[in-house]
Design a protein with these regions (language model features):
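Non-catalytic architectural context of zinc metalloproteases
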Residues: 1-52, 85, 156-168, 172, ...
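Generic detector of well-ordered alpha-helical segments enriched in charged/polar residues
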Residues: 5-8, 48-58, 66-70, 145, ...
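Active-site-flanking segments in enzyme catalytic domains
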Residues: 73-215
């Protein structure tokens, strides 16, 4: 808890641990399992690892950026929930959802990979939510879709998600690079979040996106 308190004070966010997450977790559209269901040692190690990743990730943002999610009265803002599991069809290890005053970000403490990337990915979702809450026209669909391959449809619109489809991604040696990976083709929001995730923590790979004639 002390490690979380330091991050709260330093970055102007709220961090909930274990059973503290119960009320906020119930607001998510995904079923969330709290970390107090885990073995005590595994919970402690997982929470410590994610808090360390959060510290490294938060340091990448301009000073005061994360605190700007608070409202004009200085209330609400970014609230992180460190949990045991997020139940979804896509195997997500983080999810973001909002209320009038809070942007909630749940992070799976059992996921031992891409921790910093996941934090930055979810912070972008919260950022996009915040932007749209202030100006719902901020992202022009036609302008964005014009950057995609001709005739492309995101999978959440077609209902046909294939996690192994590497076409137009950085992992395909064929056509131009339009997307980071197959998950970026799930939804426009995931596309943007994947790009921001790679710009923040995967500098070398992000260079491939920047250099691509397609993008």
């Amino acid at each position: 808890r002390q490690q979380a308190d330091v991050l709260e004070q330093r970055y102007g966010v709220r961090i909930l641990l274990s059973s503290q997450c119960r009320e906020a977790a119930a607001l998510s559209s995904y079923p969330i399992t709290l970390s107090d269901t885990m073995d005590a040692e595994a919970e402690l190690n997982g929470v410590r690892a994610v808090l360390t990743a959060m510290d490294r990730s938060f340091a990448l943002y301009p000073e005061g950026f994360l605190a700007q999610f608070r409202n004009r009265a200085g209330e609400g803002g970014l609230c992180f929930l460190l949990v045991a599991h997020i139940d979804s069809d896509y195997g997500v290890v983080g999810c973001t959802y909002d209320t009038a005053d809070w942007q909630y970000i749940a992070l799976d403490v059992q996921a031992d990979y891409m921790r910093e990337g996941t934090v930055c990915h979810e912070i972008w979702h919260a950022t996009e939510n915040e932007i749209l809450s202030r100006d719902y026209t901020a992202f022009n669909w036609d302008d964005w879709n014009a950057l995609n391959p001709a005739g492309f449809t995101y999978w959440n619109d077609s209902g046909d998600y294939d996690r192994y489809d590497a076409r137009w991604t950085m992992f395909d040696n064929g056509e131009g690079v339009y997307f980071v990976d197959s998950y970026a083709k799930l939804a426009v929001q995931e596309d943007r979040a994947r790009i921001m995730e790679y710009f923040m923590v995967h500098e070398d790979e992000a260079g491939l996106l920047i250099q691509s004639d397609a993008r």
